[in-house]
């Protein structure tokens, strides 16, 4: 049988390869299947026979595949702090930024992890992936495989997305299943993903890049060059397994960057630096999460809050009031009204006092509290316009006081009068230093517009992330309760409870704040279990 000459067709040869490489059969077992000698199979597999087939096969495999998802076989990263970034083929690194990252990793005991992507291979006459060149300075940091960073967080090092992709996170919403994911890409983006109500929201993050701009000078390349970020994502894992992610965004010329109160350079670092501003997640005082309040701004709680650690020059407050006592959404709901009655939470004045107390907790000599006009705050004036004090005895006196103040203001021609600000000052005259922004009043922190809540878009339409993107400037906003970053627009989350009663079903809400540094770069921090960092 072994001396018999066999002539296989192409389909047979492909099947032999499948049996060998996918099924893992021995040459002897394959020979039995084809009723031929073992040497016949061996000669074919070593390329001694069927040279025409091998010429074609080596140019492009005729068939391949895998039953199992190899991406589920994730490497488990060792350590408690990681810095993720990306690098492009045939492109020099930003030397100063890389050195600043290396400084960071040395000081903070962190691991630098770089995932590679390729672009414009034809421009370098690169025919095969193995011909790609990467700057030797980062080769020791390259990880191009999926990694488990912590419970609930995966690094997608295997993902290769063109740097010209407008929405690099598109299509990845369930790629990491029930976990959050870090995706290597030159942009800095973040998206909140919904989870069942009793679970934390998931996130998708991109990393920014450590390599220089290197684009084809056409439409897609020009746009990508504009949005190219010298950046990285820091991930810390504490002893309880909770992980905390935040963005690093380097200065273009110097390669230096802030991370919380530290400033890193190619030569070293400084600490104890103050930040420029913090945009708290929407406050909703009547539904405030007390743990978030203690962690974020309260005094004398046994540890330094975010406010007293980072000492921002400005605190931006959105939806300071919730207006739960008399909200237009449930003012005609008898069951809700009875619940408010039994809970003794019907008094609008009491809710205003509670809101004023929250603002008072935020006051510091080093920081100005700025209240951004928001839809829940302006609901108070809507209440004055639409409701009848005669049918609301518990609020009648306060209603009439506020209504009279409003009419006096209109009589004087004071178009800047705000009912919410007036109500706060009525119950807490000591808060006169708090600044209340008016409708469409601009408030710039560095070059970032912070005077918009997020409920209004353009031309009177509803607010959306795309509406702010199109305006051509950077924004820090709130309103959605779902933290996000997209092309210069940053969304804060919520400081109130994650379940406010009306947000039924799955939720993408998170208790997240925006930090703006002295150089105008930003990061988002998300609180978990009363913690905001490792």
Regions inferred by a protein language model and the residue ranges of each:
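DNA major-groove recognition helix of helix-turn-helix
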Residues: 45
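Core catalytic region of metal-dependent phosphoesterases/phosphodiesterases
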Residues: 58-149, 168, 290-418
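Conserved beta-sheet core of the metallophosphoesterase superfamily
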Residues: 152-154, 158-241, 448-530
